[in-house]
A protein has these predicted regions:
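Intrinsically disordered, low-complexity segments enriched in polar/charged residues with Gly/Pro
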Residues: 5-7, 145-147, 253, 261-264
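Adenine nucleotide phosphate-binding catalytic loops in nucleotide-utilizing enzymes
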Residues: 14-17, 21, 56, 81, ...
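Glycine-centered flexibility motif
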Residues: 16, 44, 66, 149-150, ...
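Short beta-strand "acidic-cap" motif of Rossmann-like dinucleotide-binding folds
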Residues: 41-46, 145-146, 168, 252
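Phosphate-binding loop of NTP-binding sites
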Residues: 20, 34-37, 57-58, 71, ...
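Short linear motifs in intrinsically disordered
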Residues: 45-46, 150-156, 259-269
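N-terminal leader/targeting and accessory segments in enzymes
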Residues: 1-107, 259-262, 283-285
Length: 286
């Protein structure tokens, strides 16, 4: 399941019936839900029953508890994450039959094709930030599609197929697969060395975020002016710009006086907060 560039990602109409291994997982059920909304036949299995399996079944998916080779049915494409071992009976059967096997991030990338992608990465806060962006865009009447690594409050899914041309996704950096998402806007909440067993070193981990933020498709980077790792990322990109290399526009946020969008007077109480946002010569309460 090697990484694919956006130009290599299969189109949805090329996938046929899709089977998800570990379909109830936080990174999988939203993708499966969006594929169902596109009219793609979906099946999948997980080690144990859950509200996510029941929700997907109600949406039209065939779901199974436990992994068995015969559950692939007529699938043409099998989706798995990095956590699925090669000796998984369903993955082994897919290999034996020569089926297309996609990493979950490639399946998500295919869902993003033809839409304006906003990909949210960072060591901490990805799920919350992705949900907030999707909520704000929905409130503006843009009806974005979204895939989030967790269920929205009051639902059993993290995926939604909207009528608008924007798609907002949570971009998991743990295995480097966030680099293959087609994206116009890259959001980096913070950078704190993590998943070093996959990346090898803190420097490699930081370099991954640099590649994420400076891909040819990225027109805008939104990142923190407070987080030390994000500040270093911004500095590295500005150095690239000074050297004449193409870089995205950068918009920073935070409490720092250097932030393009500044948070002032934050009052945190219970599960809510109030603060003022200041940008350019404008300001407004939130």
């Amino acid at each position: 399941m090697g990484l694919l560039t956006p130009i290599q990602l299969p189109r949805l109409d090329e996938l046929g019936a899709v089977h998800f291994i570990a379909i109830g997982g936080s990174g999988m059920n939203g993708i499966a839900s969006m594929m169902l909304a596109h009219g793609i036949p979906v099946s999948g299995s997980d080690r144990q029953d859950s509200k996510y399996l029941r929700s997907l079944e109600a949406q039209g998916a065939r779901v199974y508890v436990g992994h068995r080779a015969d559950q692939l049915g007529d699938a043409s494409t099998v989706v798995a994450s990095s956590a699925i071992r090669e000796d998984n009976p369903e993955l082994a059967e897919a290999r034996r039959r020569g089926l297309r096997v996609l990493h979950r991030s490639a399946a998500l990338g295919s869902l993003m094709l033809g839409r304006r992608g906003i990909a949210v990465a960072g060591t901490h806060g990805k799920t919350t930030t992705t949900a907030m962006i999707a909520h704000v865009l929905s409130g503006c009447g843009l009806d974005p599609s979204f895939v989030i690594g967790g269920a929205l409050t009051g639902t059993a899914t993290g995926g939604h197929l909207g009528s608008g041309d924007i798609v907002v996704v949570e971009a998991d950096e743990s295995d480097g697969s966030f680099l293959q998402y087609p994206r116009e806007v890259a959001v980096v909440t913070n950078i704190d060395p993590d998943h070093l067993s996959n990346w090898g070193s803190a420097d490699n981990y930081a370099d991954g975020f640099l590649r994420f933020a400076t891909a040819d498709s990225v027109r805008l980077l939104v990142t923190s002016a407070d987080d030390p790792g994000a500040v270093v990322l911004t500095e590295r990109i500005r150095q690239r710009a000074a050297a004449g290399l193409p870089v995205p526009e950068i918009m920073t946020f935070g409490t720092s006086r250097d932030a393009d969008v500044r948070i002032v007077g934050a009052d945190l109480a219970g599960t809510g907060s109030r603060f003022e946002l200041r940008w350019d010569d404008d300001a407004g309460p939130v």
